[in-house]
Every structure is written in structure tokens, then in C-alpha cells.
Amino acid sequence: MVAKRLQFDEIEVPIVKGHEKVIDKDATTEYLFINAPRDIYTVYFDSSMPIFGKNVFDGCEESSSLELNMQDRKICFYCPTRTKGRKDALWYFNIVFAGENGESLFLPGQILVNSDEVYRKTVGGKLPFVEILEKIKIKKYMDETV
């Protein structure tokens, strides 16, 4: 199976009310931050970010992973345990879309979360940033459905 890394010009990222979207372009890479100041998390994409795998935790004593399987995508989270004395953690994720001809389209990213605050704000058992990741669309497929 062929794996392809999605670029920013191929996706549409919705912004939830009260969130901030910051795009930064420079000569080498492009960044996209979705900051949720009231929910205490930031979703972060970097155009040069590698596709993450379970090996992202090599050298860590404990880690966990979570997969959300949806009709049009699979979201794989790799969540290290919190460092003693810190309330924030960096989570890694891949969103995997099924492309044409059996290829897998990957969109990797990171989420900086204040664990205590985020866990208190789950809605129906769902972490607040999952809604953003569920609504990301591939532009090519958006054009075909319109």
C-alpha cells in the first residue's frame, strides 16, 4: 500500500468558535496552529512533520495509543504519560484517509494539552480537540461532493 503525506493546500481545517488559527509560512516549512485558549490545548501541524508510528515512544517507559475508526478516516493518537510535576503533555497523532487506488493519505500532527483541564471538559466522553480532527476535509473530495 502506498502512503502519501497530505500537504496544507490539500486540506480544509475548520475553526471552532473561540479558537484562533495561526498560519506561518517561511522558506523551509509551513506551520498551522489551532489554539483553544479557553480549553487549554493547541493543535499543531507542520508541513515537514514525519508520519508518526508507535516507534515515536522508543526510549519511553510508558505510553498508550488510541484509535478512532470513522467512516472516512482513522485517527491514531500516541499519548505519552504525563511527566511528574507537569500538567501538560504532548500528544502525537496521524489522521489516515483512504485515497484513490488503495493509497493511504496521512496527516500527522501534535497536540499540546493541559491534561487536568482537558479531561474535565470532555463532552459525551469525547476530548474537545477530537471534533476539530473529525471535521478536517480533503479539498479534492470536497470539490467532488459539491
Where are these regions (language model features)?
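Intrinsically disordered, low-complexity serine/threonine-rich segments
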Residues: 11, 50-51, 66-68, 132
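Secretory pathway targeting signatures of secreted, lumenal, and periplasmic proteins
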Residues: 2-61, 83-89
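Signature of long, low-cysteine stretches enriched in small and polar/charged residues
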Residues: 55-108, 141-145
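Surface-exposed amphipathic alpha-helical segments
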Residues: 19, 107-146
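Hydrophobic residues on conserved beta-strands that form the core of alpha/beta folds
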Residues: 8, 16, 70-72, 133
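Compositionally biased, intrinsically disordered low-complexity segments
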Residues: 18, 34-37, 46, 54, ...
